[in-house]
Amino acid sequence: MSDIEQERWSRVKGRLRSTVGEDIYSSWFARMDLESVHGESVRMSVPTRFLKSWIQAHYAERVLACWQAELPDVHRIDLMVRSAMRCAAPAKEAPAADPRRPEHGDGRASTELKMVATAPASANHDALGGSPLDPRLTFASFVTGRSNTLAHAAARQVAEGRRGDSIMFNPLYIHAGVGLGKTHLLQAVTWAGNAGTERKVLYLTAEKFMYGFVAALKSQTALAFKEALRGIDVLVIDDLQFLQGKSTQAEFCHTLNALIDAGRQVVVAADRPPSDLESLDDRVRSRLAGGLVVEMGSLGEELRLGILKSRIEVARAHHASFSVPEPVLDYLAKAITHNGRDLEGAINRLLAHSKLNAQPVTLEMAEREVRDLIRPQEPRRIKIEDIQRVVARQYNVSRSDLLSSRRTANVVRPRQVAMYLAKTLTLRSLPEIGRRFGGRDHTTVLHAVRKIEALVSKDTTLSDEVELLKRQLQE
């Protein structure tokens, strides 16, 4: 860009900022760049499709007016997505504006914001208009095992769907701990879904959703924000546990309902099941639980070994001589049990040490380099449903009895024991425990906890029963 064009662009941006206001400018125009000026046509770019669509729908005439104040002969704006420009073959020059272009009633040329030739959206995450995508996180690089087979199969089915197909799982809700592959699956769905041009698949973190909604509220463009989201064919939301704020949650709930009711697919991931998302509104949890809820469990040794081998193959694509002996692989698979990120980190460390020091990978090197990645085995995470099931079996009652309003002695005591265990073995709050036991008040739970605490200190039989239940739940 020449100095003259740069000066013109600075003046146009100043006019635009004055026209729309600082908040709107910062939200929607701060990342817009000038690419070129050709006669009557100005070519500009934005980083995402979402941003392009928004500007095209709501600010086209204002953008054109700002340019015409600087260059009266400009009658056309070509707005493109930068990532598509980088990935596509060079586009042909924009044709000169048609002198017969349609006019408004006052004789002004109609505003034209046109998207020129672009590559498929899968070419780069920016073209999706959502949160950044890692090009490594595809189905091809996802390693399957017993703990993630169902989640993988469900995600593949979503990704391979076509517009108009009947939807089997909606929403698809995947939950897992940190580093177990849920983000990998969600991004794989997005890459695969956007590989063609038929469907619009948008990947957003909960944080990005919140930011977009709050920015729309501040700029008084909330309606456009809602319309844009509800025009998506597949909405993919990651890290839902971070969704905060009543108004944001309400908007997410409305969006969720609108998309599902319209036959659009929704895929969600979080670090816990819907019932454990205490900060979310009951309506949101209920709608999420109404779809397919899939847990991705901890990585078994065989799966950990598969992940290690996969990461080594990736490393060898750039470092052909890199090799990890089988004894080292076995050691890593047995010793690093926490999550897949630690396994990838271990391979990266061995690669760096081997290449930088020009030494082969040995078991001694591995033991030294990954020492801090070997963590104590975490205790099994206990769920309230597990407690209810084990207690019901122990006392020969049904789980529905524990949740009911029955006050008979053979039900009251097991219910109190289950509430006591829920308080001592989980991180759930008293109100949440009460809700999970038939919608009881938190004072009822507190009474049950104190009652059992007092009894186990005096009643050895009950104390033994409670200890037995704890062992069964922790095994």
UniProtKB/Swiss-Prot annotation:
It is found in: Cytoplasm. One of its GO terms (molecular function) is DNA replication origin binding. GO terms for biological process: DNA replication initiation; regulation of DNA replication. InterPro entries: AAA+_ATPase, Chromosome_initiator_DnaA, Chromosome_initiator_DnaA-like, Chromosome_initiator_DnaA_CS, DnaA_C, DnaA_dom, DnaA_N_dom, DnaA_N_sf. The keyword Hydrolase does not apply. Keywords: ATP-binding, Cytoplasm, DNA replication, DNA-binding, Lipid-binding, Nucleotide-binding. Residues 73-131 are annotated as: Domain II. Its main location: cytoplasm. Residues 355-475 are annotated as: Domain IV, binds dsDNA. The keyword Iron does not apply. ATP binds at residues 179, 181-183. It holds the Pfam family Bac_DnaA. Oligomerizes as a right-handed, spiral filament on DNA at oriC. Plays an essential role in the initiation and regulation of chromosomal replication. ATP-DnaA binds to the origin of replication (oriC) to initiate formation of the DNA replication initiation complex once per cell cycle. Binds the DnaA box (a 9 base pair repeat at the origin) and separates the double-stranded (ds)DNA. Forms a right-handed helical filament on oriC DNA; dsDNA binds to the exterior of the filament while single-stranded (ss)DNA is stabiized in the filament's interior. Domain I is involved in oligomerization and binding regulators, domain II is flexibile and of varying length in different bacteria, domain III forms the AAA+ region, while domain IV binds dsDNA. NCBIfam families: DnaA. Belongs to the DnaA family. This is Chromosomal replication initiator protein DnaA. It comes from Nitrobacter hamburgensis (strain DSM 10229 / NCIMB 13809 / X14). The lineage of its organism: Bacteria, Pseudomonadati, Pseudomonadota, Alphaproteobacteria, Hyphomicrobiales. The gene is dnaA.
